[in-house]
Amino acid sequence: MFFSNNFYISDMIPYDKRSGKIWYNGELVDWSNVKVHVLSHGLHYASCVFEGERVYDGSIFKLEEHTSRFFHSARRMGFEIPYSEADINAASNSIIKNQKVDNGYVRPVAWRGSEMMAISAQQTKIHVAIATWEWGSYFDPKLKVEGIRLNISNWRRPAPNTIPWDTKASGLYMICTLSKHEAEKNGYTDSLMLDHEGNIAEATGANIFFKDKSGDLHTPVPDSFLDGITRRTVIEIAKSKNIKVHERKINPNELKNFIGCFLTGTAAEVTPVSCIAENEFKVCDLIIGLNESYQQLVRKKKAA
């Protein structure tokens, strides 16, 4: 995979022009024949939820946890996915084998259909699709070694009583796109977002950790943003190494006190951060070690 100005060469093939199959409403359908009507409620009113999963050596990492969150997101958005979690797990495993994806990405998505076009849409059909494709690093592999650069976004994560914050609902990513575009325009790779109280929250699609001078880790309390599956995994790895992890409110003024920083996420995996605005960080052995342990874990199990 090659990178150029934050674009992946593999992404130059438009996603609607690819070949193979997509699992769509219970059937394997030709990639080019999967269509969504322009008057779908999910498109106009963001009644849509999704997941993002990684395939390592032919096996989906923590598939059950991702599927469980997929169903939780749908329920929080007021609709039921018309399949069981076991059905979705089986379909996900089936599609990666059909597409011969060995190391890639899986995208389940569910949305309200086009039967109604209004704020209220309780009689709409719920559509479900699962697509997969070969995919390498989310960030430039060179930057995964040197560390990526973040600005601080002007957009903030909304207060938890204003949105279904503990979901992967499509509408929640609007400010993430705005923030990342602004960061890229100004020469950064990604953006750090604050919460509604002005404390550190997360990057546009990943959780964040900091290392202090004593070797302890600090990460924001996920009370207005996702408690990521990768975040929880890395905390478990850190504790197994007797690294103390403090989950707490972190003020941006504390950035100058930390010596290391990294992001975690299904796409980002474990990615070091070299700077946030004017605050610089070292890619230290602790971060390198956590990344190595994470890579060993995700590639531990092979597909049967």
Each model region followed by its residue ranges:
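Short, acidic/charged, Gly/Pro-enriched secondary-structure junctions
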Residues: N89-M116, W133
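Helix-start/capping segments and mature chain N-termini
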Residues: M1-S94, I119-A304
